[in-house]
């Protein structure tokens, strides 16, 4: 399925920004050229996460596993343009499932492991997904049984495939089927893949992002749209073939897929997986797996330098660079990692929709600049960054719609170019608001022009009413809608409370009905049990308030609520 307009495809290919190579082409190239090199490594704690024994595979062994998975999925009717929801942690089987579905021309819809029945039911309904792949348990939660419960209310969902030591009734136990694949099944899958005529412009994924709308929005991306994002990562971090990459970010969105999965395929690297985040295990993997590149949140990098005992015995001899972002970086952290350990920090600003601004040492050598500034791409200045002429930016006054050309004045960042998607999945009304009249995508993020020559942009805030907790976008409107259904709640407003580790945590200001109240525990029990929302969307701070502050037209003044949190004044 191709959703990118043909004129865009032709334009980007004529400029040499897009090509005809698919992600499967990249994979098969490495299978041919480096069959016995190590390709992928399970997390140290894989057994605790999903059961079984952690594994490590060569490119040849990975190829055999992909062939078997493709054969089983094809035998159950999965083919071109079918949407398959995948809910798996960062284990080897996740990459294998991705590659098998890519081989068949199916569309992958990755779901965070934190999603529960509410979110899963929505994305299955929205995409018309025909199948789901999960593990019987992920950690302590029974995901196989959960998806079987969703299946009873999802008429399009034909199959739930399950990995693990047990399998719930009615689901399909993948492991014995994978072991029993025969030549006939293998040849049938090969024939189906060939006849599907998969192109680099076909959709690979529909990832999910939360904005101001109550429900998550699907972001479709093609092979070409993923490859150019991966190329930006490889270029910014100066990665080379054969490197060893450590991935602690869930492979469900831009951060996890472009920095790990796609970069791995571009480089023929070794992909070492990590999840859930565990600092001692993370450091152990850097040491034992001889890692060349990884990514981490700013708070983690600050913590390491503030507690050097954590770094005892860790050899940074091979670690060349670390990617970070999603929150402001510390100049001290960027400088210290380089001067003391020889590790360069790359500051990334990006989004599922395709905003991509790497601030790397090649273009921004000053640690103080790199911590807060991003190259102003697409305005004629030549940068070393490969994306410098492939993405275009402008800042616009959100009130007047006039372009901002002077420094120090905040404006909404708008982008277009070869990295930017063409629109949300089956959401024409939202798309009409998401792009302006000239085709620029409205990011909802506020930046200002900076630098002596206005050569940089600096993030200053968000227009969107979104809370970013540990890299996960959470729609405050969604949570407010759920809170409105609580029998004791008259009205509620949800904002982000600053947090040094996660960036933000959820804080709810609640007006209770007369003579009624509820505790934080009761509110969260209602959200997780009655509304079945993901655990990471729970309220972490509850403030009781007599009335929500509003402007003259009735809009809730969330800035005042955030100010109350910052001042420590209870409402």
PLM regions: where:
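AMP-binding/adenylate-forming catalytic core of the ANL superfamily
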Residues: 115-122, 132-134, 294, 417, ...
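Structural core segment of the AMP-binding/adenylate-forming
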Residues: 76, 106-180, 298, 514-516
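AMP-binding/adenylate-forming catalytic domain of the ANL superfamily
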Residues: 162-163, 532-556, 571
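Conserved AMP-binding/adenylate-forming
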Residues: 287, 322, 329, 334-456, ...
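N-lobe entry segment of adenylate-forming
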Residues: 1-57, 61-76, 166-168, 192-194, ...
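Conserved AMP-binding/adenylate-forming core of the ANL superfamily
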Residues: 17-19, 39-91, 95-99, 116-121, ...
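Conserved AMP-binding/adenylation subdomain of ANL enzymes
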Residues: 227-244, 252-293, 307-308
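Conserved pre-ATP/AMP-binding loop-to-beta segment of ANL
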Residues: 35-38, 162, 167-168, 172-175, ...
């Amino acid at each position: 399925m191709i959703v990118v307009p043909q004129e865009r495809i032709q334009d980007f290919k004529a400029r040499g920004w897009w090509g005809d190579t698919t992600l499967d082409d990249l994979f098969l190239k490495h299978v041919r050229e480096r069959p016995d090199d190590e390709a992928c490594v399970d997390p140290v704690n894989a057994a605790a996460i999903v059961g079984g024994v952690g594994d490590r595979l060569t490119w040849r062994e990975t190829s055999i596993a992909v062939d078997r998975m493709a054969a089983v999925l094809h035998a159950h009717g999965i083919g071109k343009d079918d949407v398959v929801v995948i809910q798996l942690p960062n284990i080897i089987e996740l990459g294998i499932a991705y590659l098998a579905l890519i081989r068949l021309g199916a569309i992958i819809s990755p779901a965070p492991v934190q999603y529960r029945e509410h979110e899963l039911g929505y994305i299955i309904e929205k995409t018309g997904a025909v199948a789901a792949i999960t593990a019987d348990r992920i950690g302590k939660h029974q995901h196989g049984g959960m998806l079987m419960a969703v299946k009873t209310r999802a008429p399009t969902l034909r199959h739930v495939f399950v990995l693990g030591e047990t399998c719930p009734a009615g689901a399909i136990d993948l492991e014995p089927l994978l072991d029993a694949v025969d030549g006939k099944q293998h040849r049938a899958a090969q024939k189906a893949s060939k006849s599907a005529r998969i192109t680099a412009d076909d959709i690979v994924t529909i990832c999910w992002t939360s904005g101001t709308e109550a429900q998550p929005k699907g972001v479709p991306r093609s092979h070409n749209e993923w490859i150019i994002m991966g190329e930006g990562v490889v270029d910014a971090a100066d990665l080379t073939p054969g490197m060893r990459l450590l991935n602690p970010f869930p492979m469900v969105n831009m951060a996890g897929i472009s920095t790990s999965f796609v970069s791995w395929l571009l480089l023929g690297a070794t992909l070492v997986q990590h999840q859930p985040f565990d600092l001692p295990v993370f450091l152990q993997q850097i040491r034992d797996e001889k890692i060349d590149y990884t990514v981490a949140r700013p708070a983690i990098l600050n913590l390491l330098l503030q507690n050097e005992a954590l770094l005892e015995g860790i050899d940074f001899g091979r670690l060349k660079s670390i990617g970070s972002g999603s929150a402001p970086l510390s100049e001290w952290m960027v400088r210290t990692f380089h001067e003391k350990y020889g590790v360069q920090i790359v500051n990334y600003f990006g989004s599922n929709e395709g905003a991509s601004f790497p601030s790397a040492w090649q273009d921004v050598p000053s640690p103080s600049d790199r911590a807060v500034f991003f190259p102003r791409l697409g305005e004629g200045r030549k940068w070393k960054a490969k994306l410098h002429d492939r993405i275009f930016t402008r800042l616009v006054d959100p009130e007047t719609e006039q372009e901002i050309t002077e420094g120090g004045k905040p404006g909404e960042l708008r982008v277009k170019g070869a990295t930017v998607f063409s629109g949300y999945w089956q959401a024409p009304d939202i798309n009409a608001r998401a792009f302006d009249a000239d085709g620029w995508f409205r990011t909802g993020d506020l930046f200002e022009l900076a630098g002596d020559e206005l050569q940089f942009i600096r993030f200053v805030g968000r227009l969107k009413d979104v809370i970013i907790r540990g890299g996960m976008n959470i729609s405050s409107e969604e949570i407010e809608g759920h809170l409105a259904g609580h029998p004791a709640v008259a009205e509620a407003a949800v904002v982000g409370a600053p947090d040094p580790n996660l960036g933000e945590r959820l804080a709810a200001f609640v007006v209770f009905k007369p003579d009624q109240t509820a505790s934080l525990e009761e509110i969260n029990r209602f959200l997780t049990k009655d509304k079945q929302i993901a655990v990471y969307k729970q309220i972490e701070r509850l403030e009781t308030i007599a009335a929500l502050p509003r402007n003259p037209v009735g809009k809730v003044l969330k800035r005042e609520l955030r100010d109350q949190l910052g001042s420590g004044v209870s409402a």
